[in-house]
Every structure is written in C-alpha cells, then in structure tokens.
Amino acid sequence: NTIYVPLGMKAGLEKIVDVARRAGIPDSVEMVATPSVSLGAASPHVIDLANAYATFAAQGVHAKPFIINEVQGPNKGILFQGRIQAQEVFRKDVMADLTYALSKATTSGTAAVVGARVARPTAGKTGTSNDNASAWFNGYTPEVAASVAFYRDDATQTLNGIGGLTSVTGGSFPARIWAEFVKGYLKKAPVQEFPPPAYIGGIEPISFINSVPEMDPALIPPSPSPSPSNKKKR
C-alpha cells in the first residue's frame, strides 16, 4: 500500500480529502491532508463507507443516506416519507475507470473470494488496520453497495484468533460476509454489467519505482557530526 503515499502526494492531499467528502464521507469524520490520508487514516462509520461506495456504483451520483423510509399513522396515513436527495459529484468516465480498477481486487486481488462467490460483476477494496485491530470490506455491484467491518470494543485489541484464523484481514471474514449478503440479495435479479473503462490518460503504465516523496525541509533532522578520527598520521 505504500505506493499510494507518493501517488497521493502527486495528486494533492487536499484533493483526496475533497474526493472523500464528495463521495459521502461527512465533515463529522476528521480527515487531515497528510500523507497517511491516502492509506485510510480516518475513522468513518460503516454507513459512511457504504454510502461512498454507493456513489461509485451510481456512476458518480451521490445520494444522502436515510434509515427510515416511511412512517404510517394509525389509519395508515403517511406521516413521513423519506426522499432521495441525489447530486452528480463525479464524471461518469472517471467512475468507469475507478470501477475497472476496483474490480481487479475482487477477481484476482485480496478479495478474490468475492468474485468467486458472487459470480457477477463486483468491485471493492479490502482494508486492514495495524496489528489487525480492524478489518473491512467495502464494495458494490451495478445494483447495490455494502460495507462490512470487524473490530472489537477495545480498538487496541487484535482480531487475530477469531474463528481460528491466525490473521483476520479484510479479505477474510468481511469479504466472505459481504459476498454472501450480496449473493442472496441479488439471487433473483438479472446480471448487470459495469460500464467499460474509459482509459482516461491512456493505457501506458506509469512507474513510481523511483519516486521519492518530498519532505518538508523543516522536518528533516540535521545530519550527525562526523566522529573524530583517532588514527595517527604516518
């Protein structure tokens, strides 16, 4: 994942925060424009990430989530009706390329179990925090988006050992649960396809092998003074 640090710095850290906000991560979730923001250094709720991935599934249209759809009175009169508030926040071609990239994670990446079990177009991303203290899988199909998270009440405790696994990651239980939910949810639905990738900027690979992030000179510690030599001159 370290490649995303120089990539994020090249794209612009403020832009990363802006994209997250537009996708659906609310202002109540603290996000600081530092290099670690590219690695997920924030603490959103599960519904926040499900909402963000729903924006990707809807080809860049963000809809504000709501939990209560309808409230009926004693005479079955509708007292409250939830309304979809939607706005296009990303270009469709950008979302097509994003989906193409994320679909690789569910076919041959860390969440390959998703593609194998759902057996229809899927896209998503696993996430595992330091010391395996939390594990996530967020993903979508053309029809639905969902998020599954594992963590303990004490965020400092590791998940390792749960279910007999020595290492609990986003590609283990979270991905499996997500796959079973989506498989059941879409059991009788016709298979839909994602839009083809737009290949914005071309298809030539870009190398970051020799890319070194620039650091603020004020943060660079001074070089140590050379040790005095005890050798005698001849």
Residue ranges and their predicted role:
Residues 1-25, 31-58, 104:
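Active-site-adjacent helix/loop patches that line small-molecule binding or acyl-intermediate pockets
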Residues 43-207, 214-221:
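A penicillin-recognizing enzyme superfamily signal
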Residues 17-31, 117, 149-157:
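Active-site-adjacent bridging/hinge elements
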Residues 222-234:
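Long, low-complexity, intrinsically disordered segments
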